[in-house]
Amino acid sequence: MAKRSKAYLAAAEKIDADKLYSPLQAAKLAKETSSTKMDATVEVAVRLGVDPRKADQMVRGTVNLPHGTGKTARVIVFAVGEKAAEAEAAGADVVGAEDLIERIQGGWVDFDAAIATPDQMAKVGRIARVLGPRGLMPNPKTGTVTADVTKAVNDIKGGKINFRVDKQANLHFVIGKASFDDEKLVENYGAALDEILRAKPSSAKGRYVKKITVSTTTGPGIPVDPNRTRNLLEDAADA
């Protein structure tokens, strides 16, 4: 196990590991316990009661965070002709087809999201082994395989995020930066949680949301009450 810094250990002492915090309390604590002087990213990890090995229990989806992520996503688009021009006009960072595929085959993955027009998907399939494990493979279910490239680029640049359960039944997503107001972090958290609850597979049995942890990228995890799904901003007095 990696040795923790003094700043991390001091931050961890502020957290009661046996307590389940409200989302608002967790947002405040995450900002207080960030162990970096930079504007840290605030992240959420959710453990779900599903079996990802079963196709009918794969949880995935998208959510437009009301306050964005605090980061302008770097977006690439696989398109040609008129659709390529539309993607460039919408603000896509890199647009291409064969040339872009070859660049990625060469090891370049410096982007946060990938969009493709339907006619390009057969070609993009050649780099599925590169994009898939990174959660970057365009998919119709997340709106990233589409003819409306303008909307897709604008959505992602505006704070749209994807979530997908991993092999351990965990979801990871960003809700903002430590510089965000507490309320904005909580509202982003609530928007994402709502979508995750809506994505519950009908075949999932027992408790769906088992565990939630909030942290900054370099800070300690803060356990959040998974039963708190409504009225998330009510804890101002005791947070």
From Swiss-Prot:
The keyword Endoplasmic reticulum does not apply. GO terms for molecular function: rRNA binding; structural constituent of ribosome; tRNA binding. GO terms for biological process: regulation of translation; translation. PROSITE patterns: RIBOSOMAL_L1 (PS01199). Gene3D superfamilies: 3.30.190.20, 3.40.50.790. InterPro entries: Ribosom_uL1_bac-type, Ribosomal_uL1, Ribosomal_uL1-like, Ribosomal_uL1/biogenesis, Ribosomal_uL1_3-a/b-sand, Ribosomal_uL1_CS. One of its GO terms (cellular component) is large ribosomal subunit. CDD domains: Ribosomal_L1 (cd00403). Keywords: Repressor, Ribonucleoprotein, Ribosomal protein, RNA-binding, rRNA-binding, Translation regulation, tRNA-binding. Belongs to the universal ribosomal protein uL1 family. Binds directly to 23S rRNA. The L1 stalk is quite mobile in the ribosome, and is involved in E site tRNA release. Protein L1 is also a translational repressor protein, it controls the translation of the L11 operon by binding to its mRNA. Part of the 50S ribosomal subunit. HAMAP family: Ribosomal_uL1_B. This is Large ribosomal subunit protein uL1. It comes from Rhodococcus erythropolis (strain PR4 / NBRC 100887).
